[in-house]
Regions:
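Short beta-strand segments
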Residues: 35-69
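Extreme N-terminal tail/first-helix region
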Residues: 1-30
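A short helix-loop-beta-strand connector motif used in the catalytic cores of GNAT acetyltransferases and
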Residues: 33-37, 143-144
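Short hydrophobic/aromatic-rich motifs at helix boundaries and adjacent loops
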Residues: 9-13, 47-50, 83-84
Length: 155
């Protein structure tokens, strides 16, 4: 089993992954790392406290997207849905956005493909080659939530 899969065995981060995620989220929130690495800030659906975690932004056609490499059951996806998509992203500065879920698999597919090219660690969780034809991504797309970022003032 690869290290990336070990970190998220069972679809949930283990202690080491949580510590690394916390550090990476803090770094990206302060503007460290590449521009496409952001800290997502979303209220916990049970606790209400702000949860921060690092995510990779995929860009397609000038639009920005977030993808769940672990699929539907992860907490950040549940928290985003519970918050009605109202979240903040940080990379040096705080940006309030509305995350609009992309439902149609044919619209998710190009985003998923762009995401895999940028987030190389995601390939351990998304069972497809980043250079596969778009039709293969369409078959896989329903398993991976995709959210389009809309600036809050234009949502």
């Amino acid at each position: 089993m690869g290290l990336q899969r070990w970190f998220y065995r069972g679809g949930r981060p283990n202690l080491m992954a949580r510590l690394l995620d916390r550090g990476t989220a803090a770094l990206s929130a302060r503007g460290g790392g590449p521009e496409y690495l952001v800290a997502l800030e979303v209220p916990g659906r049970r606790s209400g406290r702000i949860i921060s975690l690092p995510l990779v932004v995929a860009t397609v056609g000038g639009e920005r997207y977030l993808v769940s490499m672990l699929g539907e059951g992860v907490n950040w996806v549940r928290n985003v849905r519970a918050a009605g998509g109202e979240v903040a992203l940080r990379h040096g500065r705080r940006e309030e956005v509305h995350l609009q879920e992309v439902v149609a698999p044919d619209l998710r597919a190009p985003v998923l493909k762009a995401y895999l090219k940028r987030a190389t660690n995601a390939s351990a969780h998304v069972p497809i080659d980043k250079d596969a034809p778009l039709a293969e991504f369409e078959r896989l797309a329903p398993r991976f939530p995709v959210f389009r970022m809309v600036p809050r003032n234009s949502a």
